[in-house]
Protein backbone atom coordinates (compact mmCIF):
# COMPACT_ATOMS: atom_id res chain seq x y z
CA UNK A 1 0.00 0.00 0.00
CA UNK A 2 1.35 3.36 -0.95
CA UNK A 3 1.09 6.61 0.88
CA UNK A 4 -1.89 8.71 -0.16
CA UNK A 5 -0.04 11.92 0.47
CA UNK A 6 3.03 11.03 -1.61
CA UNK A 7 4.16 14.18 -3.48
CA UNK A 8 5.76 12.11 -6.26
CA UNK A 9 2.56 10.16 -6.87
CA UNK A 10 4.38 6.92 -7.02
CA UNK A 11 1.17 4.97 -6.35
CA UNK A 12 -1.85 7.07 -7.30
CA UNK A 13 -4.28 4.23 -6.51
CA UNK A 14 -3.12 3.82 -2.93
CA UNK A 15 -6.41 5.05 -1.52
CA UNK A 16 -8.38 2.34 -3.36
CA UNK A 17 -9.06 -0.68 -1.16
CA UNK A 18 -7.41 -3.92 -2.30
CA UNK A 19 -9.61 -6.79 -3.36
CA UNK A 20 -8.91 -10.49 -2.65
CA UNK A 21 -8.00 -12.67 -5.65
CA UNK A 22 -10.73 -14.98 -6.77
CA UNK A 23 -9.56 -18.61 -6.43
CA UNK A 24 -10.92 -21.34 -8.66
CA UNK A 25 -12.34 -24.53 -7.26
CA UNK A 26 -9.73 -26.64 -8.99
CA UNK A 27 -6.90 -24.78 -7.32
CA UNK A 28 -8.44 -25.24 -3.93
CA UNK A 29 -8.87 -28.96 -4.43
CA UNK A 30 -5.29 -29.31 -5.59
CA UNK A 31 -4.04 -27.56 -2.51
CA UNK A 32 -6.08 -29.88 -0.32
CA UNK A 33 -4.69 -32.97 -2.01
CA UNK A 34 -1.15 -31.72 -1.58
CA UNK A 35 -1.70 -31.15 2.08
CA UNK A 36 -3.16 -34.62 2.52
CA UNK A 37 -0.42 -36.46 0.56
CA UNK A 38 2.69 -35.27 2.48
CA UNK A 39 3.04 -33.22 5.61
CA UNK A 40 5.60 -30.93 3.96
CA UNK A 41 3.25 -30.11 1.15
CA UNK A 42 5.85 -30.93 -1.56
CA UNK A 43 4.89 -32.46 -4.86
CA UNK A 44 5.81 -35.95 -5.95
CA UNK A 45 8.54 -34.74 -8.29
CA UNK A 46 10.26 -32.89 -5.46
CA UNK A 47 9.80 -35.73 -3.03
CA UNK A 48 11.62 -38.12 -5.40
CA UNK A 49 14.75 -35.98 -5.04
CA UNK A 50 14.83 -36.61 -1.30
CA UNK A 51 14.18 -40.35 -1.38
CA UNK A 52 16.99 -42.52 0.20
CA UNK A 53 19.12 -44.92 -1.83
CA UNK A 54 18.41 -48.63 -1.72
CA UNK A 55 20.37 -50.65 0.91
CA UNK A 56 23.58 -52.52 -0.07
CA UNK A 57 23.40 -56.12 -1.18
CA UNK A 58 24.60 -58.58 1.42
CA UNK A 59 27.75 -60.58 0.60
CA UNK A 60 29.07 -63.39 2.78
CA UNK A 61 32.66 -62.96 4.20
CA UNK A 62 35.58 -64.69 2.32
CA UNK A 63 36.88 -67.99 3.57
CA UNK A 64 40.29 -67.90 5.37
CA UNK A 65 42.89 -70.03 3.57
CA UNK A 66 46.35 -71.14 4.77
CA UNK A 67 49.24 -69.16 3.14
CA UNK A 68 52.84 -70.43 2.77
CA UNK A 69 55.33 -69.06 5.36
CA UNK A 70 57.99 -66.42 4.58
CA UNK A 71 61.51 -67.71 3.78
CA UNK A 72 64.95 -65.95 3.93
CA UNK A 73 67.84 -65.60 1.42
CA UNK A 74 70.32 -67.83 3.18
CA UNK A 75 69.85 -70.59 0.64
CA UNK A 76 70.94 -68.26 -2.20
CA UNK A 77 74.17 -66.93 -0.57
CA UNK A 78 76.19 -69.78 -2.05
CA UNK A 79 75.33 -68.55 -5.54
CA UNK A 80 77.06 -65.16 -4.99
CA UNK A 81 80.53 -64.51 -6.51
CA UNK A 82 83.52 -64.79 -4.21
CA UNK A 83 86.57 -62.41 -4.24
CA UNK A 84 88.59 -64.95 -6.22
CA UNK A 85 86.01 -65.42 -8.97
CA UNK A 86 86.35 -63.47 -12.26
CA UNK A 87 82.77 -62.27 -11.97
CA UNK A 88 83.47 -60.62 -8.59
CA UNK A 89 85.37 -57.62 -10.13
CA UNK A 90 84.80 -57.49 -13.90
CA UNK A 91 87.36 -55.41 -15.86
CA UNK A 92 86.33 -51.89 -16.88
CA UNK A 93 85.76 -51.42 -20.59
CA UNK A 94 88.35 -49.20 -22.27
CA UNK A 95 86.64 -46.08 -23.59
CA UNK A 96 88.52 -43.54 -25.74
CA UNK A 97 88.32 -39.99 -24.45
CA UNK A 98 87.80 -37.06 -26.85
CA UNK A 99 91.32 -35.78 -26.16
CA UNK A 100 92.78 -39.24 -26.86
CA UNK A 101 90.78 -39.44 -30.07
CA UNK A 102 92.13 -36.09 -31.25
CA UNK A 103 95.67 -37.14 -30.42
CA UNK A 104 95.24 -40.43 -32.29
CA UNK A 105 93.90 -38.66 -35.38
CA UNK A 106 96.76 -36.15 -35.19
CA UNK A 107 99.33 -38.96 -35.08
CA UNK A 108 97.71 -40.68 -38.04
CA UNK A 109 97.83 -37.49 -40.05
CA UNK A 110 101.48 -36.96 -39.17
CA UNK A 111 102.32 -40.49 -40.25
CA UNK A 112 100.47 -40.00 -43.52
CA UNK A 113 102.25 -36.69 -44.05
CA UNK A 114 105.64 -38.29 -43.47
CA UNK A 115 104.81 -41.06 -45.93
CA UNK A 116 103.62 -38.58 -48.53
CA UNK A 117 106.72 -36.41 -47.99
CA UNK A 118 108.95 -39.45 -48.48
CA UNK A 119 107.17 -40.27 -51.74
CA UNK A 120 107.33 -36.69 -53.03
CA UNK A 121 110.97 -36.41 -52.02
CA UNK A 122 111.86 -39.12 -54.50
CA UNK A 123 110.21 -37.11 -57.27
CA UNK A 124 111.64 -33.75 -56.11
CA UNK A 125 114.28 -32.37 -58.49
CA UNK A 126 114.53 -28.54 -58.45
CA UNK A 127 117.21 -28.48 -61.17
CA UNK A 128 114.83 -30.02 -63.72
CA UNK A 129 111.78 -27.97 -62.74
CA UNK A 130 110.24 -26.38 -65.88
CA UNK A 131 108.83 -23.46 -63.84
CA UNK A 132 112.21 -22.62 -62.29
CA UNK A 133 113.99 -20.60 -64.98
CA UNK A 134 116.66 -17.98 -64.71
CA UNK A 135 119.80 -17.55 -62.67
CA UNK A 136 119.30 -18.97 -59.14
CA UNK A 137 121.97 -16.62 -57.69
CA UNK A 138 119.94 -13.60 -58.81
CA UNK A 139 116.59 -14.96 -57.62
CA UNK A 140 115.00 -13.88 -54.34
CA UNK A 141 112.43 -15.92 -52.43
CA UNK A 142 109.57 -14.00 -50.74
CA UNK A 143 107.09 -15.80 -48.46
CA UNK A 144 104.20 -14.95 -46.11
CA UNK A 145 102.61 -12.79 -48.77
CA UNK A 146 99.04 -11.63 -48.67
CA UNK A 147 96.87 -13.91 -50.79
CA UNK A 148 95.40 -10.86 -52.53
CA UNK A 149 98.80 -9.46 -53.55
CA UNK A 150 99.47 -9.41 -57.28
CA UNK A 151 102.70 -9.71 -59.24
CA UNK A 152 102.57 -6.04 -60.20
CA UNK A 153 102.25 -5.03 -56.54
CA UNK A 154 105.22 -7.21 -55.55
CA UNK A 155 107.28 -5.87 -58.44
CA UNK A 156 106.50 -2.28 -57.47
CA UNK A 157 107.61 -2.90 -53.88
CA UNK A 158 110.92 -4.63 -54.76
CA UNK A 159 111.91 -2.42 -57.70
CA UNK A 160 113.41 0.06 -55.24
CA UNK A 161 116.43 -2.24 -54.77
CA UNK A 162 117.19 -2.64 -58.49
CA UNK A 163 115.76 -3.58 -61.89
CA UNK A 164 113.69 -6.78 -61.88
CA UNK A 165 113.76 -9.27 -64.73
CA UNK A 166 110.84 -11.51 -63.74
CA UNK A 167 108.34 -12.04 -60.90
CA UNK A 168 106.77 -15.51 -60.54
CA UNK A 169 103.86 -15.79 -58.07
CA UNK A 170 103.34 -19.49 -57.27
CA UNK A 171 99.72 -20.68 -57.55
CA UNK A 172 97.90 -23.95 -56.99
CA UNK A 173 97.65 -26.08 -60.13
CA UNK A 174 94.10 -27.23 -59.39
CA UNK A 175 92.38 -24.11 -58.00
CA UNK A 176 94.74 -21.50 -59.51
CA UNK A 177 94.85 -19.68 -56.15
CA UNK A 178 98.10 -18.12 -54.85
CA UNK A 179 100.02 -20.06 -52.22
CA UNK A 180 101.51 -17.02 -50.50
CA UNK A 181 105.08 -17.01 -51.84
CA UNK A 182 106.87 -15.82 -54.97
CA UNK A 183 110.27 -15.75 -56.70
CA UNK A 184 111.81 -12.46 -57.89
CA UNK A 185 114.67 -12.55 -60.40
CA UNK A 186 116.86 -9.43 -60.49
CA UNK A 187 119.07 -8.24 -63.30
CA UNK A 188 122.14 -8.04 -61.03
CA UNK A 189 123.34 -10.10 -58.09
CA UNK A 190 124.14 -7.05 -55.97
CA UNK A 191 120.50 -5.92 -56.18
CA UNK A 192 119.34 -9.32 -54.98
CA UNK A 193 121.75 -9.16 -52.03
CA UNK A 194 120.57 -5.65 -51.12
CA UNK A 195 116.94 -6.77 -51.17
CA UNK A 196 117.86 -9.84 -49.11
CA UNK A 197 119.44 -7.67 -46.41
CA UNK A 198 116.92 -4.82 -46.28
CA UNK A 199 113.52 -6.18 -47.38
CA UNK A 200 113.18 -8.80 -44.66
CA UNK A 201 110.19 -7.91 -42.45
CA UNK A 202 108.79 -5.35 -44.89
CA UNK A 203 105.01 -4.87 -44.81
CA UNK A 204 103.17 -5.57 -48.08
CA UNK A 205 99.37 -5.32 -48.08
CA UNK A 206 99.26 -5.46 -44.28
CA UNK A 207 101.53 -8.51 -43.81
CA UNK A 208 105.23 -8.72 -42.96
CA UNK A 209 107.03 -10.83 -45.53
CA UNK A 210 109.99 -13.15 -45.06
CA UNK A 211 112.82 -12.78 -47.58
CA UNK A 212 115.44 -15.42 -48.38
CA UNK A 213 117.62 -16.59 -51.25
CA UNK A 214 116.58 -19.43 -53.54
CA UNK A 215 117.97 -22.50 -51.80
CA UNK A 216 116.50 -25.24 -54.01
CA UNK A 217 119.14 -24.88 -56.74
CA UNK A 218 121.92 -23.28 -54.70
CA UNK A 219 122.11 -25.44 -51.53
CA UNK A 220 122.70 -29.19 -52.03
CA UNK A 221 120.55 -31.69 -50.12
CA UNK A 222 118.05 -28.97 -49.30
CA UNK A 223 114.33 -29.66 -49.29
CA UNK A 224 111.32 -27.35 -48.97
CA UNK A 225 109.20 -27.24 -45.89
CA UNK A 226 106.39 -29.30 -47.39
CA UNK A 227 108.87 -32.17 -47.69
CA UNK A 228 110.16 -31.88 -44.12
CA UNK A 229 112.79 -29.19 -44.61
CA UNK A 230 112.80 -25.48 -44.02
CA UNK A 231 114.78 -22.26 -44.14
CA UNK A 232 118.38 -23.38 -43.64
CA UNK A 233 119.19 -24.45 -40.07
CA UNK A 234 117.27 -21.60 -38.43
CA UNK A 235 113.92 -23.33 -38.95
CA UNK A 236 113.08 -27.03 -39.02
CA UNK A 237 109.88 -28.43 -40.50
CA UNK A 238 107.71 -31.34 -39.48
CA UNK A 239 110.19 -34.09 -40.37
CA UNK A 240 112.98 -33.08 -38.02
CA UNK A 241 114.40 -36.60 -37.79
CA UNK A 242 114.55 -36.96 -41.57
CA UNK A 243 116.50 -33.74 -41.87
CA UNK A 244 118.96 -34.90 -39.23
CA UNK A 245 119.55 -38.19 -41.05
CA UNK A 246 120.28 -36.51 -44.36
CA UNK A 247 122.82 -34.06 -42.95
CA UNK A 248 126.30 -35.38 -42.24
CA UNK A 249 127.27 -35.02 -38.59
CA UNK A 250 130.94 -34.30 -39.16
CA UNK A 251 130.52 -30.95 -40.94
CA UNK A 252 128.20 -27.97 -40.89
CA UNK A 253 125.48 -27.51 -43.47
CA UNK A 254 126.16 -25.35 -46.49
CA UNK A 255 122.82 -23.61 -45.93
CA UNK A 256 124.45 -21.61 -43.13
CA UNK A 257 126.55 -19.59 -45.56
CA UNK A 258 123.73 -17.42 -47.03
CA UNK A 259 122.48 -16.70 -43.49
CA UNK A 260 125.66 -14.82 -42.50
CA UNK A 261 124.39 -11.39 -43.60
CA UNK A 262 121.34 -11.85 -41.40
CA UNK A 263 123.50 -12.65 -38.38
CA UNK A 264 125.65 -9.61 -39.08
CA UNK A 265 122.53 -7.49 -39.34
CA UNK A 266 121.29 -8.75 -35.97
CA UNK A 267 124.68 -8.00 -34.41
CA UNK A 268 124.62 -4.47 -35.79
CA UNK A 269 121.14 -3.97 -34.33
CA UNK A 270 122.33 -5.16 -30.93
CA UNK A 271 125.30 -2.79 -31.09
CA UNK A 272 122.96 0.11 -31.90
CA UNK A 273 120.76 -0.78 -28.92
CA UNK A 274 123.82 -0.90 -26.65
CA UNK A 275 124.86 2.56 -27.83
CA UNK A 276 121.40 3.94 -27.04
CA UNK A 277 121.50 2.36 -23.57
CA UNK A 278 124.94 3.87 -22.88
CA UNK A 279 123.65 7.30 -23.91
CA UNK A 280 120.63 7.00 -21.64
CA UNK A 281 122.84 5.92 -18.74
CA UNK A 282 125.20 8.85 -19.34
CA UNK A 283 122.23 11.25 -19.19
CA UNK A 284 120.81 9.64 -16.06
CA UNK A 285 124.08 9.42 -14.07
CA UNK A 286 124.43 13.15 -13.22
CA UNK A 287 120.80 13.22 -12.09
CA UNK A 288 121.29 10.24 -9.83
CA UNK A 289 124.45 11.79 -8.36
CA UNK A 290 122.59 15.00 -7.64
CA UNK A 291 119.83 13.01 -5.92
CA UNK A 292 122.12 10.75 -3.93
CA UNK A 293 124.42 13.54 -2.78
CA UNK A 294 123.56 14.59 0.81
CA UNK A 295 122.14 17.97 1.59
CA UNK A 296 125.22 19.10 3.51
CA UNK A 297 127.31 18.78 0.35
CA UNK A 298 124.73 20.78 -1.52
CA UNK A 299 124.89 23.44 1.21
CA UNK A 300 128.67 23.73 0.86
CA UNK A 301 128.40 23.80 -2.90
CA UNK A 302 125.79 26.57 -2.72
CA UNK A 303 128.12 28.60 -0.50
CA UNK A 304 130.80 28.35 -3.16
CA UNK A 305 128.32 29.38 -5.81
CA UNK A 306 126.96 32.36 -3.90
CA UNK A 307 127.10 34.63 -6.90
CA UNK A 308 124.77 32.40 -8.89
CA UNK A 309 122.29 32.28 -6.02
CA UNK A 310 122.32 36.05 -5.69
CA UNK A 311 121.60 36.45 -9.39
CA UNK A 312 118.79 33.96 -9.14
CA UNK A 313 117.35 35.75 -6.08
CA UNK A 314 117.54 39.11 -7.81
CA UNK A 315 115.66 37.67 -10.80
CA UNK A 316 113.01 36.27 -8.49
CA UNK A 317 112.67 39.64 -6.71
CA UNK A 318 112.19 41.37 -10.04
CA UNK A 319 109.53 38.84 -11.01
CA UNK A 320 107.78 39.40 -7.68
CA UNK A 321 107.80 43.17 -8.09
CA UNK A 322 106.34 42.74 -11.57
CA UNK A 323 103.62 40.47 -10.23
CA UNK A 324 102.95 42.94 -7.40
CA UNK A 325 102.68 45.80 -9.88
CA UNK A 326 100.25 43.84 -12.06
CA UNK A 327 98.15 42.99 -9.03
CA UNK A 328 98.12 46.63 -7.86
CA UNK A 329 97.08 47.73 -11.34
CA UNK A 330 94.19 45.27 -11.30
CA UNK A 331 93.19 46.46 -7.83
CA UNK A 332 93.19 50.08 -9.02
CA UNK A 333 90.92 49.19 -11.93
CA UNK A 334 88.53 47.43 -9.56
CA UNK A 335 88.67 50.43 -7.20
CA UNK A 336 87.78 52.82 -10.01
CA UNK A 337 84.84 50.67 -11.01
CA UNK A 338 83.63 50.60 -7.42
CA UNK A 339 84.21 54.36 -7.14
CA UNK A 340 82.01 55.09 -10.15
CA UNK A 341 79.26 52.82 -8.84
CA UNK A 342 79.46 54.30 -5.31
CA UNK A 343 79.50 57.83 -6.70
CA UNK A 344 76.25 57.26 -8.57
CA UNK A 345 74.75 55.65 -5.48
CA UNK A 346 75.84 58.59 -3.28
CA UNK A 347 74.30 61.09 -5.68
CA UNK A 348 70.97 59.29 -5.53
CA UNK A 349 71.14 59.12 -1.73
CA UNK A 350 72.07 62.81 -1.55
CA UNK A 351 68.96 63.75 -3.48
CA UNK A 352 66.79 61.66 -1.17
CA UNK A 353 68.35 63.18 1.96
CA UNK A 354 67.88 66.71 0.59
CA UNK A 355 64.19 65.97 0.41
CA UNK A 356 64.23 64.70 4.00
CA UNK A 357 65.36 68.08 5.35
CA UNK A 358 69.09 68.62 5.67
CA UNK A 359 70.09 65.35 7.25
CA UNK A 360 72.79 64.93 4.64
CA UNK A 361 74.87 67.76 6.07
CA UNK A 362 74.86 66.16 9.49
CA UNK A 363 75.65 62.68 8.26
CA UNK A 364 77.77 63.68 5.30
CA UNK A 365 80.40 65.26 7.48
CA UNK A 366 81.16 61.91 8.98
CA UNK A 367 81.89 60.08 5.74
CA UNK A 368 84.59 57.47 6.03
CA UNK A 369 88.10 58.02 4.89
CA UNK A 370 87.86 55.14 2.48
CA UNK A 371 84.81 56.66 0.73
CA UNK A 372 86.67 59.95 0.22
CA UNK A 373 89.67 58.16 -1.13
CA UNK A 374 87.50 56.15 -3.51
CA UNK A 375 85.79 59.35 -4.67
CA UNK A 376 89.16 60.94 -5.40
CA UNK A 377 90.31 57.77 -7.20
CA UNK A 378 93.37 57.23 -5.00
CA UNK A 379 95.08 53.82 -5.11
CA UNK A 380 94.41 51.34 -2.36
CA UNK A 381 97.94 51.55 -0.99
CA UNK A 382 97.34 55.15 0.14
CA UNK A 383 94.02 54.18 1.74
CA UNK A 384 95.63 51.84 4.24
CA UNK A 385 94.67 48.61 2.46
CA UNK A 386 98.22 47.39 3.01
CA UNK A 387 98.98 49.51 6.08
CA UNK A 388 100.09 46.41 7.96
CA UNK A 389 102.81 45.67 5.43
CA UNK A 390 105.57 48.17 6.05
CA UNK A 391 108.89 47.98 4.34
CA UNK A 392 109.88 45.13 2.06
CA UNK A 393 106.93 42.75 2.26
CA UNK A 394 106.86 39.15 1.19
CA UNK A 395 103.53 38.49 -0.49
CA UNK A 396 104.37 34.86 -1.32
CA UNK A 397 104.65 33.59 2.23
CA UNK A 398 101.59 31.36 1.77
CA UNK A 399 103.37 29.52 -1.06
CA UNK A 400 106.58 28.62 0.72
CA UNK A 401 105.28 25.19 1.67
CA UNK A 402 104.66 24.44 -2.05
CA UNK A 403 108.23 25.24 -3.12
CA UNK A 404 111.14 22.87 -3.12
CA UNK A 405 112.60 22.41 0.31
CA UNK A 406 116.24 23.07 -0.55
CA UNK A 407 115.68 26.17 -2.67
CA UNK A 408 113.34 27.67 -0.08
CA UNK A 409 115.84 27.12 2.74
CA UNK A 410 118.75 28.85 1.07
CA UNK A 411 116.63 31.67 -0.27
CA UNK A 412 115.28 32.37 3.20
CA UNK A 413 118.73 32.35 4.78
CA UNK A 414 120.10 34.62 2.11
CA UNK A 415 117.54 37.44 2.31
CA UNK A 416 114.72 38.14 4.71
CA UNK A 417 112.69 41.28 5.16
CA UNK A 418 111.81 42.80 8.50
CA UNK A 419 108.27 41.66 8.05
CA UNK A 420 109.26 38.03 7.39
CA UNK A 421 111.65 38.02 10.40
CA UNK A 422 108.82 39.00 12.70
CA UNK A 423 106.62 36.12 11.53
CA UNK A 424 106.96 32.44 12.32
CA UNK A 425 106.80 30.33 9.16
CA UNK A 426 106.10 26.67 9.29
CA UNK A 427 109.14 24.82 8.05
Swiss-Prot record:
Post-translational modification: Phosphorylated. The association and dissociation with SR45 is not affected by the phosphorylation status.
Family matches, as InterPro entries: Nucleotide-bd_a/b_plait_sf, RBD_domain_sf, RRM_dom, snRNP70_RRM, U1_U11-U12_snRNP_70-35kDa, U1snRNP70_N
Entry annotated with the keyword Cell cycle: no
SUPFAM superfamilies for the chain: RNA-binding domain, RBD
Pfam families the UniProt entry points to: RRM_1, U1snRNP70_N
Gene Ontology annotations for the cellular component aspect, listed alphabetically: nuclear speck; nucleus; spliceosomal complex
Main subcellular location: nucleus
Gly residues compositional bias, start-end: 227-241
Assembly information from the UniProt record: Component of the spliceosome. Interacts with CYP63, U2AF35A, U2AF35B, SRZ21, RSZ22, SR34, SR45, SR45A and SCL33.
Designated name of the protein: U1 small nuclear ribonucleoprotein 70 kDa
Organism of derivation: Arabidopsis thaliana
Gene name, Swiss-Prot/TrEMBL: RNU1
Amino acid sequence: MGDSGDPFLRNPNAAVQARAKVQNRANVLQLKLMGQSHPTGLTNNLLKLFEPRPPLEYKPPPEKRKCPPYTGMAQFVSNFAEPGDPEYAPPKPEVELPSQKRERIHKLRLEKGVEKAAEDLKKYDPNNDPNATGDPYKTLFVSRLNYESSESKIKREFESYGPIKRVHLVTDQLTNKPKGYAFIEYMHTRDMKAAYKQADGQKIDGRRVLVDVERGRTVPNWRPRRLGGGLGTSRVGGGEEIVGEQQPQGRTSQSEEPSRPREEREKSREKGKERERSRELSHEQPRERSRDRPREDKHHRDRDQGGRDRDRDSRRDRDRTRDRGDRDRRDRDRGRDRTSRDHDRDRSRKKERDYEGGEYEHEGGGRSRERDAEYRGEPEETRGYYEDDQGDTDRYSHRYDKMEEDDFRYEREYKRSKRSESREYVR
